[in-house]
A protein has these predicted regions:
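An N-terminally biased module of ancient metal coordination in phosphate/nucleic-acid-related enzymes
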Residues: 1-82
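Histidine-centered divalent metal-coordination motifs
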Residues: 17-21, 147, 207
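Non-catalytic positions within long, well-ordered alpha-helices that form the structural scaffold/packing
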Residues: 42, 137, 194-195
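Active-site environment of divalent metal-dependent phosphoester hydrolases
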Residues: 56-59, 94-96, 150-154, 178-181, ...
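Short acidic, glycine/proline-enriched helix-loop-strand junctions
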Residues: 59-67, 81-86, 211-238
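Extended substrate/RNA-proximal surfaces in nucleic-acid metabolism proteins
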Residues: 60-172, 250, 254-265
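Short acidic/histidine-rich active-site segments
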Residues: 198-214
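Mid-to-C-terminal alpha-helical segments outside catalytic/metal-binding sites
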Residues: 220-265
Length: 265
């Protein structure tokens, strides 16, 4: 990958958030589409994917055992098509007050459930979110708050995310957001979150070939241009470490100072 004359090379690219499994949520509608998504991922440089279908979001329920079986079946299809992509089972878990009671049915981002993708509603941040995150931490799981840049309440006050990071959570920005696929406003927020180190990983959140495809390498290239190749490499290293259940912590994060507005007479 070229970035302003700097050559960026990844031995592997790990995508921690992807709706590639066929026909189980609002992602890929069928197997053929999933295989085409897999080819697009490989073309984008992705080598490992955490398959993260929606779970408990009022539209979809994807139980742990069902996701594991779906991943096994899909991996067999990838092998038959000679697509060099390794897929792992996960979930995008929608925040619910009873997640600790459902814990046995939840999949982590890693085999030991040290990390878990946690989705907030798009419109708000539930009042019980801090308590729930603390309860998950007591169970040994660090929540990774997904696509905070698209949450309407966080958009109005980015320091809401700062508070969660300060209390031990991690956060993931979406590649499409950073690359401008959700508009300039979301792209600007994404940049601010990266600049202030309030996100620790970037992932595709790819759903379908048209509109929400793989732009992970494009986003990493832009991040390297904006903040240096070390930042892009750190994001990818974090993704690999999370998948392997190794230690990843937020560091260097800071509050975002609101810009003062001056009225001139």
């Amino acid at each position: 990958m070229l970035t302003g004359g700097i050559i960026m090379e990844f031995e592997k690219i790990v995508d921690l958030h992807c709706h590639i499994l066929p026909g189980i949520d609002d992602g890929s509608p069928d197997l053929e589409h999933s295989l085409d998504l897999a080819r697009a991922a490989v073309a984008d440089g992705v080598t490992h994917i955490l398959a993260t279908p929606h779970h408990l979001d009022n539209n979809y329920v994807n139980h742990r055992t069902d996701v594991i079986k779906a991943v096994q079946n899909f991996q067999n299809e990838l092998a038959a098509e000679q697509i060099a992509l390794q897929v792992f089972p996960g979930q995008e878990v929608h925040i619910n007050g009873d997640l600790p009671q459902r814990y046995a049915d939840l999949l982590g981002a890693d085999e030991k459930k040290r990390y878990m993708l946690l989705e907030f509603p798009h419109s708000n941040v539930p009042a019980y979110a801090k308590r729930l995150i603390f309860e998950l931490q007591k169970l040994g799981t660090t929540p990774i708050i997904v696509h905070p840049e698209r949450n309407k309440e966080i958009q109005k006050d980015l320091n809401i995310l700062y508070d969660f990071i300060q209390h031990g959570a991690l956060a993931q920005v979406t590649a499409t957001s950073y690359a401008g696929g959700f508009g300039d406003h979301v792209a600007d927020i994404s940049r601010q979150l990266v600049e202030n180190r309030l996100v620790q990983v970037v992932a595709s959140d790819a759903h379908v070939l048209q509109g929400r495809n793989f732009v992970l390498s494009e986003a990493l290239k832009q991040i390297a241009t904006d903040f240096g190749p070390e930042q892009a490499l750190e994001f990818e290293s974090n993704a690999e470490d999370i998948l392997n259940g190794l230690s990843v912590t937020a560091n260097g994060y800071r509050k975002i100072e609101k810009k003062k507005r001056f009225i001139f007479s």
